[in-house]
Amino acid sequence: EALGTDCAKFEQFPILTKFIDASNNLSIQVHPSNDYALKNEHQYGKTEMWYVLDCEPNAFLYYGFDHEISKAEFAERIQNHTLTEVLNTVPVHKGDSFFIPSGTLHAIGKGIVVAEVQQNSNVTYRVYDYGRVGADGKPRALHIEKALDVTRRTPPEKHDFGSHLAQCEYFTVDVKKGAFDGAADEKSFVSLLITDGEGELICGGETVAVKKGDSFFLPAGSG
């Protein structure tokens, strides 16, 4: 009941929310669709979105390709370490948002802090990790063959979400500034992330002080 009627179709809690502070360039990666992930990983795939909370001057991220390439070229560029030459390099600013459907190659760049809302899944296929090694001293695993299977090798599509920041089957994301009234109706819970400032949250007859970095689960029907 706490999740709401719209969540009855999901077999597990539908989303995860995170704060990501990239002190270095993160790996270039892709997430599979539900169909592919269920068949090959026995898990769901992943669609996600980023909301940029802060960034260093001249920060950028990778978001899909800047032009369409073939599967053969994709594989070759992974092997010869020239993949970034054909990726869509996007300068970022505080307040920017990016919707990342499954199959979209992506990577957060150094000096960027984002709030991430994602489908509840851990399936990630890395294609490039800058030669870094893990705690065991060995290069971190890459998943090139599976990435070749699932990656859309075209520029990212443009999306119109109307008044929402992002919207898909798994989540709807809105940005609220200043005071606002109830959002958690009987259809769905609300995951509330405090991204700036401080204030008060009044829910179910209780008042809670909130500040930047806090997160709250508001049960369905709590107003």
Predicted regions and their residues:
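Short, charged beta-turn/beta-strand-edge "cap" motif at the junction between a beta-strand
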Residues: T104-A107, S222-G223
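Noncatalytic modules at the cell exterior or secretory-pathway interfaces
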Residues: G95-F99, G223
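Extended, charged low-complexity segments
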Residues: F216, G221-S222
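N-terminal intrinsically disordered, low-complexity, charge/repeat-rich segments that act as generic
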Residues: H31, I100-P101
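Active-site region of the double-stranded beta-helix
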Residues: E1-K94, G109-L192, D196-E198, I202-G204, ...
